[in-house]
Amino acid sequence: MRIGIDARKLYDYGIGTYIRNLVKQLARLDRETEFVLLCRPQDAPGLSALGENFRPVTETAGLYSVAEQIKIPWALKREKVSLFHAPHYVLPPLVPCRSVVTIHDCIHLMFPEYLPNQFALRYARSSIRMAARRADRVLTVSESSKRDILKFVDTDPDKIHVIYNAHDERFSHEPREEDVVRVRERYQLQDEFVLYAGNVKPHKNVERLIDAFQLVHARGLDHLKLVIIGDELSKSTAVRRAVHRHNLHKFVRFLGYLPEDTLAVMYRLAGLFVFPSLYEGFGLPPLEAMASGTPVVTSNVSSLPEVAGDAAVLVNPLDAGDIADGIMRVLTDETVRRDLRRKGLARARQFSWETSARRVREIYAQVGATMPSAAPPPVVADAGGAPHPVGGGKTPTE
């Protein structure tokens, strides 16, 4: 079986993390199956290093474009792929082979107002619904996301399989002291700070986090800093207004995107990680923080309670006061912090990319088992009555 994987989003934080860790673990587990990785030209050298059975194939079709609807199926046909794995919801209808699709969440269906225009909304809706119906198997990353898919798409629930994400191994490793010193000095992190990592799109609820942070200051922790990693302040007018409204310019810092090695150190330095998102298919940052031994405050909605279990303080993300209460509870009680660290480390160990990759391989095998095998050549009798295969093959007596 030759398996194709769409790796064009390798650069992305969320789906890119999924692709990077999946192919890395597949390379460790499987040295026999041929894998064809459709990728951007700049990603091909790194993917070539996975192993002899992993072959990157450059594909320049734009993501979420009309061109990919034609060019992806053509590439799969040209490369003689027998099973295609789409690691996000785009599964072109002309795909010439069996297929598996990973639908991480239904955010574009839950929050259509976040899309830039009506064309983008129609494209997202039709792509998700078509992928869920046409794929031989649908993978998703939480029971919460599975429920959401079934809410919006009329498809067989038995073909939807939940396979959890996991944190990257680097978040479980103690950073070198010199790296800690370097990060602390470069970003001037001498004071106690609360950390948020992610973008500032509306559903991430960063504006309400700023409101909650102001309440924390008003309750006496007025020395505390809030460090936001992942987006520049200029990306969100609402967040910028919230910082201005509460006069928190000296206490809220936006550091933009940071390399994962730097992020791993940031988690270790933070007194608390807070993630008040309104919706997540999985919610990777809280798990990364727990793997780093950092106490977590996160939302009590969507997949976040499923991922965090009892290893985080859960709050109502629609209530700035409740978010502030969660922050205060952790930062003012050493016993709570110690308990969250212990539970968080244990919880993070329950998620493994190796386990996830093994389950994905099982799904590939299930789909492969349903493929029609090559039919043997028909057998006819010659003039003397001896059977021989059509096409010039020899009889057993020749």
Annotate each language-model stretch with its function.
Residues 1-386, 390, 395-398:
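Carbohydrate transferase catalytic cores enriched for Leloir-type hexosyltransferases
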